[in-house]
Amino acid sequence: MKNAGSVLSLLCVAITCATSAMAEQITFVSQGGVYQEAQTKAILDPAAKLLGITIKQDSVPDAWPMVKAQGETGKPVWDVIDTPPSNCLRGGREGLIEPLDLASMPNVKGMPEAYRTPYSVAYEFYSSVLGYNTKSLKKVPQSWADFWNVKDFPGSRALRNDPMGTLEAALLSDGVPRDKLYPLDVDRAYKRLAQIKPDIAVWWSSGGQSAQLLNDGEVDMLMIWNGRVGAVKKDNADVGFTYNDGILQNTQLCILKNAPNHATAVKFVDTAVSPDLQADLPKYIDYGPGNPAAFATGKLSAERAMELPSSPENAAKQALMSEEWWSSAEGIAAKDRWLKFVQ
C-alpha cells in the first residue's frame, strides 16, 4: 500500500506538472505573410524563449469576424491578436476584449498614452506618406499642400481609394495643424478632395498597386505606405518620399475576453512591447517599433532610425491617426460617404 501511495503521489505530481505546462502557452494571431515572419524572428520566438512558453500562431487578414464569433461562444480559442486599434476598441465596448491590466504590465504602462487604448497597446507603426518621382518632376512636393498645388507642382497624381488617411491629408493640405485634426471636419475634407479629384489619375486600392504606379512612372506623386515606397526606392533611384505630413498608424495587441490562457497572454503582451524586442523588428521589415523606448536601446543606428516612421524625429513630422475617432459614429458616417464621392 505504501508503494501504491507513492505511485499515486507521483502520478498526481506528474498530472499537476503537465497541466501547468499546458497552461504556459498562447495562441497568437496576426495578418500573415512577410510581416508575421518578421514578427516571429524579432519578437515571437524570443518572447517564447524568455517566458518559457509555447506560442501557437494563426493568421487572418481581418480578425474582427472571428473575434465576434469566438466571443459569442464565451470560449474563444485565441488569446492575443495583432489588429487595428479600432477592432480592439470595438471589441472592448462589446465585451469581447479584456481591458489592459496596467498593474501587471510595466512595459505597457511606460508607453505614451497616445500609443494605447484601454484595451490595447501599439505593436508596430507604419505611415501613409507622400511619394514622388524625382526624375519626372522639376521640383518635388514636400507636403500635402504641395500635392494639392497643381499649378506649382504639375504632374500626374494618385491617392488611396479609402477615406482613412485620405481625409486627413486633405485637411492638412488646407492648413489644419497636425495636432488639431480631430475630430475631423468631414465636410471641409470632402470639399478639399473635390478640388483635387479632377487631377487624380488613379485611386489605388492595394499596396502593390501603389508601388507599381510609382516604380513604373505611371504617376509622378502619390500617397503610399512607407514600407512600399521604401522597397521601391531600394531598386529605383528615381523614387523618393517624405515623412513630412505623413499619417502615422499602428496595429495593436489585445487579449480576448475569457482567453483560455489569460495570465500567460498578459505576460506575453508586456514582453512583446519591451524595448529590446521592439528594437529588433526593423531588422526584418520596414515597420517602426510600437514602443518609442526601442530607439534608446542602442540597437538601432541613427541611419536606420531615420528610415522608420515611428522614430522620434519622424513621428514629430506626422499626424497620429485617431482610430478612436474613426470607430465613432462620425467616423463610420465619413466612411459611408466615401463610396459616393469616388464614383
Stretches with model-predicted labels:
Residues 129-136, 171-176, 250-264, 269, ...:
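A bilobed periplasmic-binding-protein/Venus flytrap-type ligand-binding module shared by bacterial periplasmic
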Residues 110, 125-128, 187-196, 233-259, ...:
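Periplasmic-binding protein-like
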Residues 256-318:
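Mature extracytoplasmic/periplasmic domains
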Residues 33-40, 76-215:
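Extracytoplasmic ligand-binding site segments that recognize negatively charged/polar headgroups
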Residues 314-343:
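Conserved C-terminal helix/tail region of periplasmic/extracytoplasmic solute-binding proteins
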Residues 17-23:
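Sec/Tat signal peptide C-region and signal peptidase I cleavage site
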Residues 24-90:
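Early extracytoplasmic/lumenal segment of secretory-pathway proteins
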Residues 86-90, 215, 220-238:
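A ligand-binding cleft/hinge motif common to bilobed small-molecule-binding domains
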